[in-house]
């Protein structure tokens, strides 16, 4: 029997210390990784619920195990809320991750060795959009499109590649693209070559849910997303569609279970249901509007300080800063900012002269800082501090600038905690 006073702190102090240290790191560091966000206490409560004990292979009303009546309620809640949130008529909430959601889509609609056309990872795409090191580039014949020197998708280039390679599927979506994707144009190209249009909206799902970024649902045959990132929920995946094709829906359903996964994570599905309810609240739209405002405000500071922003701006939650002109590496910038308690990630830029583990840029995103309460004035100050650190790399005053910046970071983090005591 489990007793009420059982806890990790007493039983496993080494693990508990790691958890406590991570909590302190999140509270005392400014999080600017574009794919990270803070889940609400309600989401975390659902993740820690007794549903973690429940096996529920199958779908609501069609389970292979008994005792699933409450799991059915939870999963149906998540499905119905996601449909309402995104305007979908098909939803699968079972994928354990975005990558597994993507694998299920490929498995449902195309065959091994079929050709897919996706965005190059080095130009802002994702591993699962056809990168050679990913299953998507090993199982399928992947052809890649990129962005122009100005940092924009060249739709005529996408069209020409599609006409040449005749893909069975065109993959749209990104992990590091800061502009609006023309979903209608991508569908037009897909229709011209008889391909499915598959959109991975993982990075902008929260913005789309709030109506501050165009939705791909009216254009794509199928859409996937993660449920963290801008959505701000638990780590997991989601498949949606509004194409109206029941045959596609059946294929997607069986491609998740039993083809790619066994039992769903009911506790995570419960957390997804909470996340979707939160995203339907009026204040959620204000939050997402502020995410974009904050990203735009930071961009202007970097440009004023002489740093190149890829595509010269942003229309979403993220942007890339290139250091090619400064001769600085993304790895060095990432490390220096990290010393000042500012967390970013190094990122390749178009035509990057550096290797992927070094890079010539960083990716910056505003979902997490906005969720903890940063306003435009706060992120403008923050961007200035970041430029101070970057300007000082290799100079005599570098350590002093790091120390001064870290003190400012600790002060604002104390004033704007993630989880209020």
UniProtKB/Swiss-Prot annotation:
GO cellular component terms, A-Z: cytosol
Positions marked as site (Plays an important role in substrate specificity): 228
Binding site for (6S)-5,6,7,8-tetrahydrofolate: 121, 125-127
Top-level taxon of the source organism: Bacteria
Reactions mediated catalytically: (6R)-5,10-methylene-5,6,7,8-tetrahydrofolate + glycine + H2O = (6S)-5,6,7,8-tetrahydrofolate + L-serine
The UniProt record lists the keyword Iron: no
Residues recorded with modification N6-(pyridoxal phosphate)lysine: 229
MF terms (GO), sorted A to Z: glycine hydroxymethyltransferase activity; pyridoxal phosphate binding
Keyword Ion transport carried by entry: no
EC main group: transferase
EC code(s) of this entry: 2.1.2.1
GO BP of this protein: glycine biosynthetic process from serine; tetrahydrofolate interconversion
Cofactor: pyridoxal 5'-phosphate
Pfam family, one: SHMT
Keywords of this entry: Amino-acid biosynthesis, Cytoplasm, One-carbon metabolism, Pyridoxal phosphate, Transferase
SUPFAM superfamilies in UniProt: PLP-dependent transferases (SSF53383)
Function: Catalyzes the reversible interconversion of serine and glycine with tetrahydrofolate (THF) serving as the one-carbon carrier. This reaction serves as the major source of one-carbon groups required for the biosynthesis of purines, thymidylate, methionine, and other important biomolecules. Also exhibits THF-independent aldolase activity toward beta-hydroxyamino acids, producing glycine and aldehydes, via a retro-aldol mechanism.
PANTHER family in alphabetical order: SERINE HYDROXYMETHYLTRANSFERASE (PTHR11680:SF50)
Subunit architecture: Homodimer.
Family that this chain belongs to: Belongs to the SHMT family.
Name of this chain's protein: Serine hydroxymethyltransferase
Gene designation: glyA
